[in-house]
């Protein structure tokens, strides 16, 4: 299912997710790129549409490296996936990453999107990283993103959610009052 390049560490395992770790190198890119229906590794050695290399240079993260504000980096992650056909995954930044104003998204081979990993995916994971407010220092093993695994359809209808709230309240007026918020007072539409 998850094939780490280095053994897992206990701190990676969260109640509902797994922290993904930065690999040994990062690529400084000219710009972000939309994943295409090809292997990401093949994009790292070819000319882009403007006939220039997509990769400006490669950085070693094993001793730590500075990622400059406003620049785009692509980092191969230590984890690889071999998902069964019935399991997909979603990735998102850790809350600490957001508080540091670092934009991140997971990229996979043969996928035209970000952060959504299709059922049955087998291959490497990459993280696009863009520090927005200031430079950051990262090293191999640091975690900026997390992954959650999904089987089946995990959505619930508005009606079902309202019925659940009636029998087992989900929202309360405030922390000091155990009185549930009437479902008419909250919106469940997207």
Listing of model-derived features with the role each one plays in the protein:
Residues 1-190:
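DUTPase catalytic domain/fold
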């Amino acid at each position: 299912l998850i094939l780490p390049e280095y053994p897992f560490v206990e701190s990676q395992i969260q109640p509902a997710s797994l922290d993904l770790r930065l690999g040994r190198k990062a690529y400084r890119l000219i710009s972000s790129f939309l994943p295409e229906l090809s292997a990401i590794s093949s994009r790292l050695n070819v000319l882009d549409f403007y006939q220039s290399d997509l990769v400006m240079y490669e950085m070693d993260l094993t001793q730590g490296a500075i990622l400059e504000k406003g620049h785009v980096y692509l980092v191969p992650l230590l984890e690889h996936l071999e998902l069964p056909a019935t399991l997909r995954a979603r990735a998102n930044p850790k809350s600490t990453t957001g508080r540091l104003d670092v934009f991140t998204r997971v990229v996979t081979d043969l996928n035209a999107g970000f952060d959504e990993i299709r059922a049955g995916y087998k291959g490497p994971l990459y993280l696009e990283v863009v520090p927005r407010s200031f430079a950051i220092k990262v090293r191999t093993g640091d975690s900026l993103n997390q992954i959650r695994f999904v089987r089946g359809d995990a959505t619930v209808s508005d009606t079902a959610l309202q019925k659940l709230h009636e029998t087992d309240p989900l929202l309360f007026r405030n922390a000091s009052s155990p009185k549930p918020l009437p479902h008419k007072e909250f919106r469940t539409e997207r």
